[in-house]
């Protein structure tokens, strides 16, 4: 059993210390999320998305909301889009910084974990200011967010960006100049460009194999085309490259966060003049039309048209996709989720062959997976 973020069971056949075959056993955290999503309203499913990749709940919320909004033909106002990008990049940094810290522990470097976890706690403090919760926030709604960002928080995030950049430099100094750490990663778990594509690997694991594919650049959403950032790639596709790509991605996330705050537009954060979003609470208490609108939206849900859509987002673990099939009304006819962790782990039977048992933690940790999202 490999217990990092959820439970993954590997059945290994060994010849001494060499792995002859590997059979990964998944499903220990299967909860039937897709079927649940077909039996409740679109907005009611948002809290369930928190439990997919629970290390980046806001990323799941927003990806699902974008899929439903694509079905509805809605586009958020500029401030609402910028606010979502801010939440996405904070989530990306939080997920990667924990993955880097835990990976250090996997291969015997305890100190780095403490440094990384301190930065992650700062982001959770921002989550609390923004959403009211530190972990499973359920912040996003179809057509917007539950609340606007406090101005004081934006100033604090800018300070955090400077501090986090220093932590990344310290992390690199501790690990990437450590010969023992480098020897455990370089040349281990090599995935070629061809294999990465054929197995459907996405995210940092794909880019570490030298393929420059990032959905924020390839098919921009939420205004990502308005921000300047680079897509880091590796050369050899080994554990070392997967680690260094995530380090550089965090630097690019800090770069995007600074741009979002510096260019944050004014205006509403939610869709306006639509019956599918909840009105402001103060209007519900004083305006009859708003009260009726809240009642209808809460009891009957968003009235989606018939049709099929697929929306994919560049999440910390890779391409998180939602397929929605609607026959009209407030419930989806079919909900299908593309789990990046499940797709990334599919290569394990082929990848593990020929490696030593001592390489297993290094290889698994380099994938930075979450079983809650893998098993759904």
Model-derived features: positions:
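Metal/cofactor-centered catalytic core regions of large enzymes
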Residues: 3-376
